[in-house]
A protein has these predicted regions:
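Membrane-interface amphipathic segments in extracytoplasmic regions
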Residues: 1-202
Length: 202
C-alpha cells in the first residue's frame, strides 16, 4: 500500500485493485507527493506487489502511528470483479487464448483463490481484508473527486486534475443468478462492512 510523503504529512493510500487506484496515485503525485511502497513487480521477495498488501501484512511493515492520514476507495464487489474479468479477458485475447464466460472465469478464479489467495497479485482478495479498521473509506461510485478533494483540502493543496488511467471497457457482462449468489457469498464481508446491497440473485 503506497505511502506518499508531502512536506507537511505522510499519507498512506490503501490501493484496492480495480477501484481507480492508479488515477489516485497520479493525482497524489501531481499534488507533490513522493511515493514509496510502490512497484511494478514483487521484486522477487513477496507474493504480491507492495501496493496490494493486505491489512494483516501491511501492519507488520508500517505501524499505524507511522503516518498522518490513511484512506481507501472501495467499489461494489460484483462490479469490481466484472472489471477484473474484463482486464483478464483482454489479456487472454492478446495471448491468443480461448475466451471464457464470466461464470466460468469466476468459478475458476475462486478455485484458484482457494489454492493461492494471492492470485492475480491479490486482486481477488476481499476488500475488507485489504483495508485496516478505522480507515477513511470513499466509494468509487461517488467519484474519485470525493477522495482526492478531501485529501487536497486537508493538505492545503489545490485540487489536481484527475487523470483516468486504465479505464475499462463499457460493454455489459452477463451475470447469471447462480454466479451472483457465489459472488455475494465470497464477498459477504465486503457487502456487510461497506454497505453495498447484495446483487440480484445474491
Amino acid at each position: 500500500m503506497p505511502l506518499f510523503r508531502f512536506d507537511t504529512a505522510l499519507l498512506l493510500f490503501i490501493h484496492v485493485p480495480k477501484t481507480g487506484g492508479s488515477s489516485i496515485e497520479a493525482a497524489l503525485r501531481r499534488m507533490g507527493g513522493r511515493p514509496a511502497l510502490l512497484a511494478a513487480t514483487t521484486q522477487g521477495y513477496a507474493r504480491c506487489t507492495p501496493q496490494h498488501m493486505q491489512a494483516e501484512v501491511l501492519s507488520t511493515f508500517v505501524p499505524e502511528d507511522f503516518y498522518d492520514m490513511r484512506f481507501a476507495v472501495v467499489r461494489d464487489p460484483q462490479s469490481r470483479l466484472v472489471s477484473e474479468f474484463k482486464m483478464r479477458r483482454a489479456g487472454r485475447k492478446q495471448r491468443g487464448l480461448a475466451a471464457l464466460s464470466f461464470s466460468d472465469w469466476v468459478a475458476q478464479t475462486f478455485k484458484r483463490y482457494e489454492r493461492n489467495p494471492y492470485v492475480f497479485d491479490n486482486h481477488i482478495r476481499p476488500q475488507s481484508a485489504l483495508i485496516p479498521e478505522r480507515t477513511e473509506v470513499f466509494r468509487l461510485e461517488d467519484g474519485l473527486e470525493a477522495a482526492v478533494g478531501t485529501v487536497a483540502r486537508r493538505l492545503g493543496r489545490a485540487m489536481p486534475e484527475l487523470p483516468l488511467i486504465r479505464q475499462g471497457t463499457t460493454d455489459p457482462v452477463l451475470v447469471p443468478a447462480k454466479t451472483a449468489r457465489n459472488i455475494a457469498a465470497f464477498y459477504r464481508d465486503d457487502y456487510a462492512r461497506f454497505g453495498y446491497p447484495a446483487p440480484e440473485g445474491g
